[in-house]
Amino acid sequence: TTAPLVPAVAADPAAIARGKYLVAIAGCNDCHTPGYFFGKPDMARFLGGSEVGFEIPGLGVFHGPNLTPDKATGLGDWTDAEIVAALQKGQRPDGRVLAPIMPWHAFAHLTKQDVGGIVAYLRSLPAVAHKVPGPFGPAEPPTSFVMKIVPPSAK
């Protein structure tokens, strides 16, 4: 058998506090908290998923998903190892890759203790029932406010 991706980190206050700190400095709320892009983050739904999508030319529109432990709309049905794979490998439980805007490459270098702390913190949050729109393919019209990401043209 293979070793688990997640260390056996008990959901103790120190691990949760470390995870909270890392989530804050990583700016996870920027893309995953409703209202953030309108300058009025809804802290009652902290990390509950964004209603604003990012349009990436040729790829479609992606929304920051719900990171709370809600079983229907968040990470509640994900295992700890699946959360770690998303954070450090950019891979969803069904094998699809996460949206290109997710900075998993940076998180790939987190220590096992740090990623375990993030998982413990996300598990400690109140569940927020909030289904985000999309994703929408390149030819699909989005049903939400969209921020366009336009790469510089090659010269």
Region roles according to the model:
Residues G19, I25-G35, I83, I118, ...:
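The canonical Cys-X-X-Cys-His
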Residues T1-L5, A81-V84:
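Short, contiguous, well-ordered secondary-structure segments
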Residues T2-A8, D12-A14, T33-F62, P93-K155:
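Flexible coil segments in periplasmic/lumen-exposed cytochrome c-class electron-transfer proteins
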Residues D70-A81, A85-Q91, W104-F107, V119-S124:
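A structural feature that tracks compact, well-ordered secondary-structure segments
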Residues G19, G27, G60, G74-G76, ...:
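Glycine-centered flexibility sites
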